[in-house]
Amino acid sequence: MISESIDTYRYLGKYIVSCQEKNGAIAWEPSSKIDPWDHVESAMGLDVLGFEDNSKKAYKWLVDSQESDGSWFSEYKKEKVTKFRKETNFAAYIATGAWHHYINFENKKFLQDLWPTIQKSINFVLEGQTIDGDILWAKDKSNEWMDDSLLTGCSSIYKLSLIHI
């Protein structure tokens, strides 16, 4: 039986906060790169550890940095885009994070406020779905869909692998 309380792990939340920039973005390490997937993972860590205000700042960054097509670029450094790919699994993951935040804080207003951003991100993901049902991995720097679908089940996106014999 585990006897530690959540307070035992608050130092981890403090570390995540040390990686958070003023605009709410959470880097891999202080002053390091930012990607939307790990950013959401970090926000969920903040949720579990009780850092609600910092988590909300993280989601605000997602709202503020979302592209008009509902996506995010795959990598940022400070406020500059460093990788221009737009990945479907990154776009979909905000929905998972938002639900996680709700489970921790039961804040319906948070979900309502975030809903337009989630809806745009899911629409982006669905635009990448092929006739076979798989979801293309990403758009490239030219904003064209890449002809590739991931086999991973990440972000609760089902991606089908077609085997051609």
Feature map (PLM): residue ranges:
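Extended ligand-binding clefts on enzyme/binding-domain cores
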Residues: 2-4, 10-11, 32, 112-116, ...
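Helix-terminus loop motifs that line ligand-binding clefts
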Residues: 50-122, 126-129
